[in-house]
């Protein structure tokens, strides 16, 4: 079931996204895979927030933030890492929720393979693994093998997706999905409630200098996959 709360302000939508799932379909080395992850950490942004990409109005870069709710806004951070936001609020008002961390549920070893490939800097998963119906040109498995030689210690499970760039690398989210409708493959957002006993924490956002004290970061407390703030 697609979340019906995304027409709300980002500060309403961001905590409600916690527990929702992202399902990504890819083809890697000729085999189709389904990657499923549960959102455990988000940050809220909108056009009235000086820390937001939407601040100052629409542009070629941030146009998706002003588009329909339930679509994807993807950008590159520090020239290296893709980050993704779920667009919210009615079309015309720039708003979105950064997906800051997810908990892997299905396809964990494929996510690990993609993340390990990225660690050696050659196979940037978001560019080199195609969507469903297309094959992988990057041989990410070979790159992962190289990564294993370079690093003695493989990635710990909790480190696979505990940051916005890691999320996009593990789920193969890049600019090809800019503006993507999250009701459709190859990346689908589904509503799911919090598990019994789970509670939501709130804090300032991570790594920003403007409006830095605003409590716009939301996370599932005690979840091992929440990023280190």
Regions found by a protein language model. Give the residues of each.
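Conserved, well-structured core segments that form or line functional sites
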Residues: 1-128, 134-137, 142-229
């Amino acid at each position: 079931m697609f979340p019906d709360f995304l027409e709300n302000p980002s500060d309403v939508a961001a905590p409600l996204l916690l527990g929702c799932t992202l399902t990504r379909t890819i083809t890697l080395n000729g085999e189709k895979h389904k990657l499923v992850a549960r959102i455990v950490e988000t940050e809220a942004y909108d056009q009235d927030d000086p820390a937001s990409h939407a601040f100052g109005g629409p542009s070629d870069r941030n146009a998706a933030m002003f588009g329909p709710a339930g679509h994807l806004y993807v950008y590159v951070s520090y020239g290296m890492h893709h980050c993704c936001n779920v667009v919210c609020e009615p079309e015309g008002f720039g708003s979105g929720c950064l997906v800051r961390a997810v908990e892997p549920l299905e396809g964990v070893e494929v996510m690990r393979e993609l993340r390990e490939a990225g660690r050696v800097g050659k196979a940037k998963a978001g560019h080199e693994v195609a969507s469903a119906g297309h094959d992988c040109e990057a041989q990410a498995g070979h790159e992962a093998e190289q990564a294993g030689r370079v690093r003695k210690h493989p990635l710990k499970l909790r480190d696979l997706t505990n940051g916005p760039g890691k999320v996009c690398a593990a789920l193969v989210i890049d600019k090809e999905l800019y503006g993507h409708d999250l009701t459709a493959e190859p990346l689908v957002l589904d509503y799911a409630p919090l598990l019994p006993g789970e509670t939501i924490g709130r804090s300032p956002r991570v790594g920003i200098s403007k409006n830095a004290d605003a409590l716009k970061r939301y996370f599932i407390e005690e979840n091992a996959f929440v990023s280190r703030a």
